[in-house]
Every structure is written in C-alpha cells, then in structure tokens.
Amino acid sequence: MARNKIALIGSGMIGGTLAHLAGLKELGDIVLFDIADGVPQGKGLDIAQSSPVEGFNAKLTGSSDYAAIEGADVCIVTAGVPRKPGMSRDDLLGINLKVMEQVGAGIKKYAPNAFVICITNPLDAMVWALQKFSGLPANKVVGMAGVLDSSRFRLFLAEEFNVSVQDVTAFVLGGHGDTMVPLARYSTVGGIPLTDLVKMGWVTAERLEEIIQRTRDGGAEIVGLLKTGSAFYAPAASAIEMAESYLKDKKRVLPCAAHLTGQYGVKDMYVGVPTVIGAGGVERVIEIELNKDEEAAFQKSVGAVAGLCEACINIAPALK
C-alpha cells in the first residue's frame, strides 16, 4: 500500500514543526515546499536525520518547485508573512492574499484531490480565498483556528482549576481573531458545564470572562513575548490533529473554519464552527442552538469576517 503524502506549503517555523510532528506520528511521506530555495531542503534534511534516533519511518524532502507536491493527500498551507508586534491578523491581508493566489494555482495543478488545511492569517479570509483560487470542493478546504483557540481555552481553564487538560473540553465559535466567541455553557470540566462551575463557586463569572478574553488574545500574547514572530508549536499540533482525523477517517468533532451554505444563517463564507472531519473531508457541520447574547457575538464575528472578504474582493475582483 502506498504511503500517504503530506505537502507542507511554507517551510517557516510552523512548516518545520509540522514536518517533525508528521514524521513522529508516521502520517506519511513529507514534502516541505517554500519559495525561499534551500530552506525546505535544509529543514527536510535536518528532520530526516532525526529519524534514526526517533525511530520513525517517513521520507522527508524539500523543494522550491510546486511539482514536488504532486498527488499529495493532504496539503497544509502556512505560506505568507506572520504577525509582528502591534500588527493585527488583518494587517497581513494584502500581502498574504497574493500568496494564496499562487498557492491555490499550485494545488489546483498538482494536488487537486488533496484535503487542504489553511493556517495563513487572517485565517477566515485566507481560507475562503484559497478555496476560490484553487477551485477545490469546499468540503476539502478548511481553516485551522478553532482547534488552536479551544486548546488555549482548555489550557487556561485547566490551570485555573488545577485539573488535567484532558478533562477540559472547550467550545469556540466564530472568526479567528478578536471577535471569536468562546462558549462557556458548552465548555466543561469532567463533563460539568462552566456555567455550573460558577454556581458551584469554583470560579466567578468575572474571572471566567478574564480567561475568555485571554483566549481571544492568545496569539497576540505570544507575539508580544516573542517579539520576532508568532506562535508555531500549538498551531502545528492543531493542524496535525485535523490531518490525522482525515487520513485515518477518525470522524473527530473538531472546530474549524468551514464553508457554510446557510448554517447559522451564513452563506458562502468560512467561519469557525464545530465539524466532523473524516475521509470525506468536512463531512458535517454541527449547528447548535445559540442564546441571544451568543447569537449577537457570533453575528459580530461573522460581520468582521465578511468585511475581510470584501477587502479581498477589492484587491482581487476575480474572487467575487
């Protein structure tokens, strides 16, 4: 049986971490791609040289030619410029939109049957543009946001309550940015909703709101600390979880930026929602009941994403 092929488009900090994780988990053979010739080849060689020590079987190669991604089963896209301190994800729009156009053309030509996971920011607009530029079916193109945002929320909650992260589930809806909507009543510790934990005196509503705000600012907090770049370990781990669910047909329930066709009252846009990911790509979008406040917060988030998509159309009218 042929091994799966994983193409990593963009070989920066996230790309290199993705390659290492995909190798350790033996998800398949790995191709690192980057327009900066030498970088993907060097990182591929370095990680490959760890395989005898780590004991994993995966072929790693690097290339600056899109032909190298031919026939990939999964493409994970991190190409583009990362955030610097003081930049919002949206400041990156013009630069990274042009990158998505090139990446979309490369995937369309060489890996039209791939499951594509986009990580490039501003996420919700970039994954929307990438799907249009590539022409791939919308259920085969997703954005990595919710898994990371939920993971941050889970960590902060586990630290607050001094419990294992494994026993914390968290629910985050909406765009990947300042308007994301972490939902407390759908988030649990050992199956107990956070709203009940407030009643039980484990945490005050005010403290919970602080944790929710820290989750929203999770990426910016790391950008501020690093000063020279943005997060890469947790984003890479999050994308690998999605890729693994697709490759192994796990049917994991994972929050992703998915293409909506009327769910939550949203059409032809990518927004963070709970999905089921299996061999068919996004096999299902799970539509939950929102109360009035949650609905208002979600619609505000949708509005922010819509504004970014409009800005994309102004730059590249072909996206309309």
Curated annotation (Swiss-Prot):
Write down the SUPFAM superfamilies for this protein, in alphabetical order. Answer: LDH C-terminal domain-like (SSF56327), NAD(P)-binding Rossmann-fold domains (SSF51735)
Residues reported to bind NAD(+): 10-15, 34, 96, 119-121
Q: Which residues bind substrate?
A: 83, 89, 121, 152
CDD domains attached to this UniProt entry: LDH-like_MDH
Q: What does this protein do?
A: Catalyzes the reversible oxidation of malate to oxaloacetate.
Question: Per the record, what are the reactions this protein catalyses?
Answer: (S)-malate + NAD(+) = oxaloacetate + NADH + H(+)
According to its UniProt record, the EC number is: 1.1.1.37
Which HAMAP family does this entry report, sorted A to Z? Malate_dehydrog_3
- Protein name (database record): Malate dehydrogenase
InterPro entries, from UniProt? L-lactate/malate_DH, Lactate/malate_DH_C, Lactate/malate_DH_N, Lactate_DH/Glyco_Ohase_4_C, Malate_DH_type3, NAD(P)-bd_dom_sf
Q: Identify the catalytic residues.
A: 176
Question: Which keywords label this protein?
Answer: NAD, Oxidoreductase, Tricarboxylic acid cycle
- Family designation: Belongs to the LDH/MDH superfamily. MDH type 3 family.
Q: Name one GO biological process term.
A: lactate metabolic process
Q: Which gene encodes it?
A: mdh
Molecular functions (GO terms): L-lactate dehydrogenase activity; L-malate dehydrogenase (NAD+) activity
